[in-house]
Amino acid sequence: MRVKKLSLRNFRNYKEAQFIPHPSINIITGPNAQGKTNLLEAIYYSLRGCSFRAEKDRDVTNWESNHTVINTEVNLSSRLIKLQWKIQEGSKKLSLNGVERPRSELDLFGVVLFCPEDLSLIKGSPQERRHFLDYEVGTLSPGYSQLWRQYAKILSQRNSLLKEIRDHRSKQEVLEVWDEQLYRYGAKVIYLRLQVLKKLIPIARKTHFGLTGGTEELQAKYLSSLVLEPGLSEGQIYQVFSSSSKKIRQMELKRCQTLLGPHRDDLSLAINGVEAKTFGSQGQQRTVTLSLKLSQLDLWYHEFGEYPVLLLDDVLFELDRSRQNMLIDKILNKVQTFITTSFTGGIEETIKGAGLLWQVNAGSLTQKEEF
């Protein structure tokens, strides 16, 4: 998969911009706060229908305008597909080849983002690892994002109801309606997470083994708040969720919190049997993160026969030189990649003949050289 052309109107600090990227490596350089990350955000938005850093669509629109247009041409499976996003206050519309389509059509397009925040994936909170997992599930399982949003909505309403019951403003019988929905949607979320991990973990283990020269073995395990046996069906997870929740009902009423479910789960990562979060060095933790990110590329390829687009937002030079070379070796001439950086660090020599260098200045994009 390749982004062939990107045109922007009123996106962040880009009032009008056109970008015809190299099919392999694109290094986007320039001073801070000039629009490097904005360009990656535009690519991400065009392929996923949302921003990776703004909560509201209005935030991506240039402050002097009330609308944004993103036009993208993508080569996918030997087909040229034209995407257009029109974003206005309170609405956004997607068109594919001139025909208005639902956002679910974007499941065809793959994009993997690697940003500085990802480097804290291992030592960060369980929420960060759940976010990583949910993003991966969402790219491979159509409708998952909507499923998760529905679960989160049910969870919020159930927690509010627990407080009302504790304060004698609602009856406990009302909880049963929300319980059934919580178990049903929660079981679906857990089941889909486990199915994707079943595919992702073997690839990540193989990748990590190669990145470390065969000296480290990566182990990954889904840590559920429920006691789950391996290989359970969605229906069996539902039953475990239901029976386990009923046993702690009084504790939940006391705390006014839902104490079981996918919102409490985590992903355990270990190196040679030792927990990476607590005992891994910074270099080891970053290698685990790199292994997980590269495995996303390979899993997409295994599932769809093409590599997704890779966005490296100011992260390449956060890795040491050996890991930089490992990453470049993995993607060179295989994965269309967009790299933002304030300085190139001599990386041009590593990818000579397979990319373009771009300069961004105050929302203006110019090609500097081919290397």
Curated annotation (Swiss-Prot):
Entry GO terms, CC: cytoplasm
Ligand binding (ATP): G30, P31, N32, A33, Q34, G35, K36, T37
Gene Ontology biological-process entries: DNA replication; DNA synthesis involved in DNA repair; double-strand break repair; SOS response
Transmembrane portions of the chain: none
Keyword DNA repair recorded: yes
Any coiled-coil regions, as ranges: none
Gene Ontology molecular function: ATP binding; single-stranded DNA binding
Keyword list, A-Z: ATP-binding, Cytoplasm, DNA damage, DNA repair, DNA replication, DNA-binding, Nucleotide-binding, SOS response
Compartmental location: Cytoplasm
Cited SUPFAM superfamilies: P-loop containing nucleoside triphosphate hydrolases (SSF52540)
Top-level taxon: Bacteria
Database matches in InterPro entries: DNA-binding_RecF (IPR001238), DNA-binding_RecF_CS (IPR018078), P-loop_NTPase (IPR027417), RecF/RecN/SMC_N (IPR003395), RecF_2 (IPR042174)
Protein family (similarity comment): Belongs to the RecF family.
Function text: The RecF protein is involved in DNA metabolism; it is required for DNA replication and normal SOS inducibility. RecF binds preferentially to single-stranded, linear DNA. It also seems to bind ATP.
Protein name listed in UniProt: DNA replication and repair protein RecF
Species, as recorded: Desulforamulus reducens (strain ATCC BAA-1160 / DSM 100696 / MI-1)
Gene name in the database record: recF
